[in-house]
Amino acid sequence: MSSSYWAVVPAAGVGKRMEADIPKQYLPLMGKTVIEHTLARLLQHPRIQAVVVAVSSEDRWWSERLFQDNERIIRVTGGAERCHSVRNGLESLMALAAPEDWVLVHDAARPCLRKEDIDRLIETLHDHPMGGLLALPISDTVKRADAEGSVMETVDRKGLWRAMTPQMFPLAKLYNSLREAIAAGVQVTDEASAMEWAGFSPRLIEGYSDNIKITHPQDLAQAEVFLKRQERGE
C-alpha cells in the first residue's frame, strides 16, 4: 500500500521585515496574493491530497481569500511561533492521515515553488526512512560577525547548505519529534532541526534557486520576475 502526501503551510507570521501594514503572505503579487500563488502550486500537484493552512486567530485577511471554500484546504489556528503553527497543522493531520503518510511543510512566502521540486522530493524520498528537504549549496563567501557588525572570521563554506522548503517527512515521526522538541525548549527553526534533535539525519536535495522566500520588500519584484520566467517555460 502506497503512502499519501499532504502539505502544511504555516501562515500565522506577521513579516515585520517587510515594513508593510499587512502580513507578507497577503501582499499583492501579479494580481493575486503571495499565499494564493503558494497554495496554488501545492494544490496543482496531483500527489498532494490536501493542504493544511495554519493562520493566526487574529487574521482578518484570510476570510477574503480565494481559497476559503476549497475543500482541499484545511484551516487551523496557528501558534506563537512557526514551529507551533506547524505542530498544530500536523496535529490536525494525525486525525485524517496514516502515521506513515508523508507531509510536506512549505513556507507561505515561497510562491515560486516548481512542480519539478515537489517531484524531486517525492521521487527521492518515497522509500527513505526519515525524509529530507530542499536546499541549496552555499556558493557565496560566508562571514561571521560580532554584535557590532564587524567581521570576526570567514567561515569555511564546504559542506554548508541553505535550507529551503518544502521539507518532507513521515507524518508521525515529524509530529512526535516537533512536539517533543518544543516541550524540551529546543529552538526549532525548521522541521529538519526538530528531526535532527530527535536523532535523525534528513536528506538534502538540491532545489531550484528561484524558490525564494519573500522576506524583504525587494523580494516581491524578484518573485514576479521568476514567476514570469516560469510562465514562459524557463
Swiss-Prot record:
Signal peptide: none
Pfam families to which the protein is assigned, alphabetical: IspD
Top-rank lineage group of the source organism: Bacteria
GO term, biological process aspect, one: isopentenyl diphosphate biosynthetic process, methylerythritol 4-phosphate pathway
Positions MEP for the nucleophilic attack, annotated site positions: 157, 213
Record site: Transition state stabilizer: 17, 24
Pathway: Isoprenoid biosynthesis; isopentenyl diphosphate biosynthesis via DXP pathway; isopentenyl diphosphate from 1-deoxy-D-xylulose 5-phosphate: step 2/6
Gene3D superfamilies: Spore Coat Polysaccharide Biosynthesis Protein SpsA, Chain A
Gene Ontology molecular-function annotations: 2-C-methyl-D-erythritol 4-phosphate cytidylyltransferase activity
E.C. designation(s): 2.7.7.60
Catalysed conversion reaction: 2-C-methyl-D-erythritol 4-phosphate + CTP + H(+) = 4-CDP-2-C-methyl-D-erythritol + diphosphate
Coiled coil region boundaries: none
Keyword check for Transferase: yes
Function: Catalyzes the formation of 4-diphosphocytidyl-2-C-methyl-D-erythritol from CTP and 2-C-methyl-D-erythritol 4-phosphate (MEP).
Family to which this protein belongs: Belongs to the IspD/TarI cytidylyltransferase family. IspD subfamily.
Protein name as it appears in the record: 2-C-methyl-D-erythritol 4-phosphate cytidylyltransferase
Gene this protein is translated from: ispD
